[in-house]
Structures are given as C-alpha cells and as structure tokens.
Amino acid sequence: MERKVSRISLASEPNITYFLQVSWEETVGSGFVITLTDGHSAWTATVSESEISQEADDMAMEKEKYADELRKALVSGSGSDTYKFIFSRESCHFSLEKELKDVSFRLGSFNLDKVPNSTEVIRELICYCLDTIAEKQAKNEHLQKENDRLLRDWNDVQGRFEKCVIAKEALEADLYQRFILVLNEKKTKIRSLHKLLDEIQQLEKNLKPERETKCSEKTTDQDAIYDGSTDEEAGASVLAEAAVCKEDSLFSSPDVTDIAPSRKRRHHMQKNLGTEPKMAPQEQQLQGKERLASSLPHTLKEEHEHTSAGNMSLETLRNSSPEDIFD
C-alpha cells in the first residue's frame, strides 16, 4: 500500500496545522483511505470506487479526470492557493474546493469518523513519517555517494581528457612541423627538377643546330654517294678503259693488219638484218687468211700466223668489251 502525508491548513482555522494522510492500493481512482489529525484528535474515512464514480457523475466529469484532480489535491500537496480544505468538528464533514481566478467549485466531500484511540493513529503517522525520513535520508546518502563517485569519475575523465587534448595539440604541432619539413623538401626537389629540366631543354636547344648541320652533311654525303657510279658500273668502265687501251696499243702497231672494224661492221649489219648466221663472217675470214698465207713467203707466213693469233686474241678482247655484251 502506498501512502502520502501532507500538511494542510483549514479555511476556518488557518493558524492550526493539520496533517492529511492518504493511502491507496492501486490508484486513487480505485479507492483510498483518508486520515486527518491535528496532533490531539484523529478522524478517518474510507472512500470506495463507487463513491468516486458517483461524485464524477454529479460533477459531469469523466472518472479518470476526476480521479486525477483528487490525486493532485490530496496527494500532490498543492498549496492552499489552489485548493481550499473545509472541516467541521461537529459534523465531521470534510470537503475540498478548487479555486480558479474568480470562482471556486466543490471537488469532493467526505464524512469522517472520529478515531477513539487517536494516540495510536498519531503514533503510526509519526512512525511512518520517521520511516519515510530515514528512507529518504538513506536514499539521499546513497545518491550523495553516487554523486561523489560520479564527480570523481568526471574529474578523472576531465583530467584524462585534458591530457588527451594536450597530447593531441603536441601531436598536431609535431605533425605540422613534419609536414612543413616534408613540404619544403618536396618544394626543393621540385625546384631542382625544374632547374634540371630547364638545363636539359637549353642543352637540346644548343645541340639542335649541330644536329641539323650533321644531318645536312650526311644528306650531302648520301647525295654524293648516290651520284657516284656503282661497283658494276665502275667495273664496266675499268674494263672498257682497259679494252680501249689495249685496242689502241694494238691498232698503233704498223705490222698488224686491223681487220676488226670490217668484221665488226659486218657483225652489226648481220645483227641488224637478222637474216645471216653469225658464223659466216668468221668462215669468210678464215678463207681469206688461207689465200693470203699461200701467196706469202715462208717467213711472212710465220709472221702472218703470229699476227693472226694476235688478231684472234684481239677479237676475243673486243667480244668481251661492254659494247659487245650489250649488243
């Protein structure tokens, strides 16, 4: 069972202090026991749930709202400025009214019974008050200890937090210094790389004319090489010169009859006409040589044979010349 003891003043006796005790099982709306005492006498009454419902119907209010108003007046301990209590010792009638700005209305009324042994009621009331005070004091002490513990924890946390803040600031300062050092190193490295890049670009600019000069010289040499004769052309020219020289040396001899031009003319004529075989001039030449050999003396015959052998070698050289090859 729950209890609530409050101190009130009656409207008829404002200088006298009364103590009002209300106890209930579940809620105030389910019924309660009211006890009133002035320290000498005591009055009590039991209010049922049906009576509360009847009072709510008489006031045209809902039961829950009416029970809430009773709880505020009897249990919450509101001051006399909001609620007014009226009690008559002769009739033992107890009523309470709620005061508004300009009006007041009756919230409830109960018929109390005087307790024959008021001392027991007062003793129970005092014991309850003392127990409540002890309980509240123990709870207060427990809360105070808890508050002290929380305060110590808070101080400890605050100290750790301050240390963490100091360490954080020191770490930030150290990291900032390291960042500045790394940044300066990077800037220095970037400057050196830019400087090296500029030097390389300047060197490339300086080497570019030399490269162009070398390229132009190389192109000139290649043009000169392309303008020169090939190995085959050079060999052919050398052979032609040798053949010409040998022909000149042979042609300049007064003792040898040069029959090569007539033979060559015949050879060209036969090639252009394309009707006679190439071996016919050689046969005619051999016949002419035989007739000439029969008419000459023996000595001239030997000389003629020697000359014929030279002419044959000359013909071989002439046939091996570049002109005969291309013919």
Curated annotation (Swiss-Prot):
Q: What's this protein's name?
A: DNA repair protein XRCC4
For biological process, the GO terms are: base-excision repair; double-strand break repair via nonhomologous end joining; immunoglobulin V(D)J recombination; protein localization to site of double-strand break; response to X-ray
For this chain, the Swiss-Prot or TrEMBL PTM comment says: Phosphorylated by PRKDC at the C-terminus in response to DNA damage; Ser-253 constitutes the main phosphorylation sites. Phosphorylations by PRKDC at the C-terminus of XRCC4 and NHEJ1/XLF are highly redundant and regulate ability of the XRCC4-NHEJ1/XLF subcomplex to bridge DNA. Phosphorylation by PRKDC does not prevent interaction with NHEJ1/XLF but disrupts ability to bridge DNA and promotes detachment from DNA. Phosphorylation at Ser-320 and Ser-321 by PRKDC promotes recognition by the SCF(FBXW7) complex and subsequent ubiquitination via 'Lys-63'-linked ubiquitin. Ubiquitinated at Lys-289 by the SCF(FBXW7) complex via 'Lys-63'-linked ubiquitination, thereby promoting double-strand break repair: the SCF(FBXW7) complex specifically recognizes XRCC4 when phosphorylated at Ser-320 and Ser-321 by PRKDC, and 'Lys-63'-linked ubiquitination facilitates DNA non-homologous end joining (NHEJ) by enhancing association with XRCC5/Ku80 and XRCC6/Ku70. Monoubiquitinated.
Q: Which residues carry this modification: Phosphoserine?
A: 53, 192, 229, 249, 253, 294-295, 308, 313, 320-321
Q: Which UniProt keywords apply?
A: Chromosome, Coiled coil, Cytoplasm, DNA damage, DNA recombination, DNA repair, DNA-binding, Isopeptide bond, Nucleus, Phosphoprotein, Ubl conjugation
The GO terms describing molecular function are: DNA binding; enzyme binding; FHA domain binding; identical protein binding
> What lineage does UniProt assign to this protein's organism?
Eukaryota, Metazoa, Chordata, Craniata, Vertebrata
- Give the position of the cross-link Glycyl lysine isopeptide (Lys-Gly) (interchain with G-Cter in SUMO): 208
Modified sites of kind Phosphotyrosine? 226
Region Interaction with IFFO1, as annotated, extends over 1-211
Originating organism: Cricetulus griseus (Chinese hamster)
List residues, modification Phosphothreonine. Answer: 230, 316
Q: Where is the composition biased (Polar residues)?
A: 308-327
Q: Where is this motif: Nuclear localization signal?
A: 263-268
Annotated region (Interaction with LIG4) at 179-210, 179-211
Q: Which residues form a coiled coil?
A: 133-153, 183-213
Q: Name the site position(s) for Cleavage.
A: 258-259
